[in-house]
From Swiss-Prot:
Source organism superkingdom: Viruses
Name this polypeptide is given: Intermediate capsid protein VP6
Record's subunit section: Homotrimer. Interacts with the inner capsid protein VP2. Interacts with the outer capsid glycoprotein VP7. Interacts with the outer capsid protein VP5*.
Miscellaneous comment in the UniProt entry for this protein: The VP6 trimer contains a zinc ion located at the center of the molecule. The zinc ion is not essential for either trimerization or transcription activity of the DLP. Zinc-depleted VP6 has an increased sensitivity to proteases.
Chain residues that bind Ca(2+): N266, D286
């Protein structure tokens, strides 16, 4: 894997810097490195593809070295270099695709394609060994079963979940009280509602709670907490739990009271915040518990009082909500996040070449399915294919 990264890094630098008119002295070190790559690869044969619709391709390396010059690089020099670069880039691209479409239930962190296994040989270590990529660094750590650490921005840690629970219900669905939520990606939105605006509740207050368990532990997380849930701020028609009917939700938004968010690890509270909004942090956690209250306003203008009558019908429904968004965090496991395209890269290649469903990943690389059942086998394979996708993205956009 590190050899593949080094190949890609050398080729990217060569493609960017070996251009007509450049002084040879400015790129002499790069050309020496480029020639070392050619020397190491010459005389070797590889085969890629042969799975799904990914075609079999054979690769043979027999290239001349780039020479030295006291002057600027001319058109002939650059054309010779470009022919070599283009062949190598095509080779790296196909090795990456060949690796990205394979999976294994055992030792999925190790190379799975014949071409990458061959590149793992000791003789290829002479190719400008470079371990500067976060993905490569963590792949090496995971390969040795040592602790890894990925930094993510808006990590897709929450499987998609959108539903509701009713704490008070009746067949007519005209005086409901409960909670509805939408968890997806890096964000939780939860709303508590009471059609009667807590008119008969103790102290005219309804208590709500929402607990979310993560599939992986996050550490050093920067989080935004807001006293609102905008996705539940407009009228909608909702299917009943049994699917037999629908009910109408017409929210009027109040500010939540006594808001508390707890971050827990293995059942132990690590961080707690009360009535604090904006940016907060959490050291390490695998569970988030949100609790908040809906309090009937003790004093209301006639207009507000008309919204919340003391008896049915309740045409407007008192609602309070919270939004929690993980802006950045560190995780030992690889995840999809907002700043990278690894999941899309892997998925698009597998779709384009009609790769059959294997023993590890769900059909279509469905992220909600994948993260919901994030087994050690999936974790190993995902880290490997994301690492390869990061290498491919250096050359192929």
């Amino acid at each position: 894997m590190d050899v593949l990264y080094s190949l890609s890094k050398t080729l990217k630098d060569a493609r960017d810097k070996i251009v007509e008119g450049t002084l040879y002295s400015n790129v002499s070190d790069l050309i020496q490195q480029f020639n070392q790559m050619i020397i190491t690869m010459n005389g070797n044969e590889f085969q890629t593809g042969g799975i799904g619709n990914l075609p079999i391709r054979n690769w043979n390396f027999d290239f001349g070295l780039l020479g030295t010059t006291l002057l600027n690089l001319d058109a002939n020099y650059v054309e010779t270099a470009r022919n070599t670069i283009d062949y190598f880039v095509d080779f790296v691209d196909n090795v990456c695709m060949d690796e990205m479409v394979r999976e294994s239930q055992r030792n999925g962190i190790a190379p799975q394609s014949d071409s990458l296994r061959k590149l793992s040989g000791i003789k290829f270590k002479r190719i400008n060994f470079d371990n500067s990529s976060e993905y490569i660094e963590n792949w090496n750590l995971q390969n040795r079963r040592q602790r890894t650490g990925f930094t993510f921005h808006k990590p897709n840690i929450f499987p998609y979940s959108a539903s509701f629970t009713l704490n008070r219900s009746q067949p007519a669905h005209d005086n409901l009280m409960g909670t509805m939520w939408l968890n997806a990606g890096s964000e939780i939105q939860v709303a508590g509602f009471d059609y009667s605006c807590a008119i008969n509740a103790p102290a005219n207050t309804q208590q709500f709670e929402h607990i979310v368990q993560l599939r992986r532990v996050l550490t050093t997380a920067t989080i935004t907490l807001l006293p609102d849930a905008e996705r539940f701020s407009f009228p909608r028609v909702i299917n009943s739990a049994d699917g037999a009917t629908t009910w109408y939700f017409n929210p009027v938004i109040l500010r939540p009271n006594n808001v508390e968010v707890e971050f827990l690890l293995n059942g132990q509270i690590i961080n707690t915040y009360q009535a604090r909004f904006g940016t907060i942090i959490a050291r390490n956690f695998d569970t988030i518990r949100l609790s908040f209250q809906l309090m009937r306003p003790p004093n209301m203008t006639p207009t507000v009082a008309a919204l919340f009558p003391n008896a049915q019908p309740f045409e407007h429904h008192a609602t309070v909500g919270l939004t929690l968004r993980i802006e950045s965090a560190v995780c030992e496991s690889v995840l999809a996040d907002a700043s990278e395209t690894m999941l899309a890269n892997v998925t698009s290649v597998r779709q384009e070449y009609a790769i059959p469903v294997g023993p590890v990943f769900p059909p279509g690389m469905n992220w909600t399915d994948l993260i919901t059942n994030y087994s050690p086998s999936r974790e190993d394979n995902l880290q490997r294919v994301f690492t390869v996708a990061s290498i491919r993205s250096m050359l192929i956009k």
